[in-house]
Regions:
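Conserved AMP-binding/adenylation subdomain of ANL enzymes
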Residues: 1-34, 49
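Active-site glycine-centered loops adjacent to acidic/histidine catalytic or metal-binding residues
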Residues: 68, 92, 114, 129, ...
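AMP-binding/adenylate-forming catalytic core of the ANL superfamily
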Residues: 29, 36, 144, 149-150, ...
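Conserved beta-loop-beta connector loops within the AMP-binding
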Residues: 123-141, 175-178
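Gly/Ser/Thr-rich phosphate-binding loop
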Residues: 7-10, 33-38, 48-109, 121
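Alpha-helix capping/helix-boundary segments
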Residues: 41-43, 71, 147
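Short Gly/Pro-enriched turn/cap motifs at secondary-structure boundaries
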Residues: 111-116, 131, 161-164
Length: 205
């Protein structure tokens, strides 16, 4: 992420302190960035701070991107109402070195992770590796040119994660009729109730 701004002649703001709501709010107000990347937890914390303070800083943001965990729809809507700009929620991984599933500027649907980014393919499979139908929860697999080859000196993990050109993300998703993907949880934290996958994440929401 640090090299992307440089590739288009932009500047990056580096902060070596702890990213608290106070410190990040100060940076936004002081340096007036036009693009802001954060995790949902920090977006929520900033909203809480500004609501408590009674005002948000005036920042010329033209793009806000969230990753690292699923963005709760309520946080996205509150941010848009307060700041006048959507949060572009996306999904990436260390293994893929890039965001491969994302909403788009002007085409944001909160509560979903959007659609596949150009250059990447995604599919959902069941426990036997068969593709699942629309509306059925399955594990997300992705392939694209940025994928890692393996885990250094971790043969067993490599075999579990990389299947030919496809990388298993460990994330459970549901695909809508419109082709958007809804996050349902991790494969290692979901459980079945009467044959149906249940996600702690969905229950919490």
């Amino acid at each position: 992420g640090m090299s992307f701004p440089l590739s288009v002649g932009a500047s990056s703001l580096l902060f070596n302190g702890r990213p608290t709501p106070d410190s990040v709010s100060h940076i936004l107000e002081t340096y007036q960035p036009t693009v802001y990347y954060g995790v949902p937890t920090l977006f929520a914390a900033l909203l809480h701070k500004w609501e408590t303070d009674g005002a948000a800083p005036q920042v010329p943001l033209r793009c806000c991107t969230s990753a690292g965990e699923a963005l709760p729809a309520e946080i996205g809507r509150k941010w848009r109402d307060l700041m006048g700009i959507d949060i572009i929620d996306g999904v990436g991984s260390t293994e893929m070195l890039h965001i491969f599933l994302s909403n788009r500027p002007g085409d944001v649907q909160y509560g979903t992770s959007g659609t596949a980014v150009p250059g990447y393919e995604v599919r959902l499979v069941d426990e036997d590796g068969a593709e699942v139908s629309t509306g059925v929860v399955g594990e997300l697999l992705v392939r694209g040119g940025s994928a890692a080859a393996d885990y250094w000196n971790q043969r067993d993990k490599t075999r579990r994660t990389f299947e030919g050109e496809w990388t298993r993300t460990g994330d459970k998703y549901e695909r809508t009729a419109a082709g958007r993907f809804i996050y349902c949880g991790r494969t290692d934290d979901m459980f079945k109730v009467s044959g149906i996958w249940v996600s702690p994440f969905e229950i919490e929401q």
